[in-house]
A protein has these predicted regions:
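Conserved N-terminal entry element of GNAT/NAT acetyltransferase domains
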Residues: 1-27, 139-140, 151-173
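Conserved donor-binding loop and adjoining core beta-sheet/short helix segment
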Residues: 6-14, 18-112, 223-243, 252
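A structural microfeature
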Residues: 70-71, 142-144, 230-231, 261, ...
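Acyl-donor-binding surface of acyltransferase catalytic domains
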Residues: 75-165, 171, 305-309
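Conserved acetyl-CoA-binding loop-helix of GNAT-fold acetyltransferases
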Residues: 91-107, 251-253, 257-274, 291, ...
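Conserved hydrophobic beta-strand within the GNAT/NAT acetyltransferase core sheet
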Residues: 118-121, 246, 279-284
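Conserved active-site tyrosine of GNAT-family acetyltransferases
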Residues: 129-133, 292-294, 298
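Flexible, substrate/cofactor-facing loop regions flanked by secondary structure
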Residues: 154-244
Length: 312
């Protein structure tokens, strides 16, 4: 079968969203492709807040003669690329063309050494993609991302917090400012100025809240005895795939090692289950994070690896 490649157009946002839902179900609800919420989060955070666009330059579609989507190639972070394919239409020729497009169009200049580089992700054990990447001269992977999941069927654990802490949905106003501040502290612990900037202008978080799947009642926070936000976990419930994804999850440095992130996740998963979710997901890029999520019940996983090629 022949496919036609073209660049992203604004009308494709909803089409790609539906494509990811459909192929996720085709793949038995395993994250072979992205879930719908990751696409939304990248568009409304990566592109809107972190200058990872424009979409018209960072996303390519392959379509059948009937105009149906067969595959999507997109970045997440500059130069780091993901291949999303309809499993029934996947061929070596199509995947080869997608990798070639990434090499040609979706590279970046490394901030560390100033060299041109391109990265493509592959699930470990995917012999077809790994053979293509080797043929194109990609280095064997060093960095990996785990996609962890658990069943939400059956009884789920109640959130447990230290005395004086409470777990609930995030409020607005001052609490939103505090949530933005803690996000900066948690993800940039060596840069307090970043946390202050996060709180001074919350436009970035308002952008995330524009994502179609965002729900305030699933934006979970743990609140300390003094009323400050101590930890958070945002849950994305998809009523088509009946899944719940945790992203992001973090705890303020001064409140860590109290089980607060786990409590937020458990609260979010229970709420999502009440809405109909039957499977929960959370991604991790480090051993400590993976260990935390395993304790929270996410004991099943598949691993993705980032292959990098240095360009001339």
């Amino acid at each position: 079968m022949e496919f036609t490649r073209r660049a992203y157009e604004p009308r494709d946002f909803w089409r790609i969203r539906a494509f990811l839902r459909d192929t996720f179900l085709q793949n038995g609800r395993e994250e072979i492709n992205w879930q719908c919420c990751r696409w939304e989060y990248w568009v409304w955070h990566g592109v809107a807040n972190r200058d990872e666009g424009p979409l018209e330059e960072k996303v390519f579609l392959w379509e059948t003669a009937d105009g149906e989507i067969a595959a999507v190639l997109n970045s997440e972070s500059k130069g780091s690329n993901f291949l999303q394919l309809d499993p029934e239409l996947r061929t070596e020729e199509l995947e080869d063309e997608m990798v070639a497009t990434a090499v040609e169009r979706l590279w970046t200049v490394s901030k560390k050494d100033g060299k041109k580089k391109v990265a493509v992700w592959s699930h470990e054990g995917d012999g077809l993609r790994e053979s293509i990447l080797r043929r194109y001269g990609f280095d064997e992977p060093v960095f990996r991302e785990r996609q962890n999941w658990r069943s939400l069927e059956g009884e789920l654990p109640e959130p447990v917090t230290p005395a004086g802490y409470a777990v609930r949905a995030m409020g607005d106003g001052a609490e939103l400012l505090d949530r933005c501040y803690v996000s900066g502290l948690a993800f940039h612990p060596d840069d307090p100025a970043f946390a202050h900037e996060n709180r001074e202008d919350v436009t970035w978080y308002r952008n995330i809240q524009k994502a179609p799947l965002y729900r305030r009642d699933l934006d979970i926070v743990a609140v300390a005895p003094d009323g400050a936000v101590a930890s958070f976990a945002t849950i994305w419930f998809d009523d088509v795939t009946l899944t719940a994804v945790c992203e992001p999850v973090a705890t303020s440095p001064r409140h860590q090692r109290k089980g607060l992130a786990t409590a937020c996740i458990h609260e979010g998963m229970k709420r999502a289950k009440a809405m109909g979710a039957t499977k929960g997901f959370v991604g991790s890029g480090s051993e400590p994070a993976s260990a935390t999520y395993e304790k929270a019940g996410f004991t099943e996983r598949i691993t993705m690896a980032q292959w990098i090629k240095e360009l001339d």
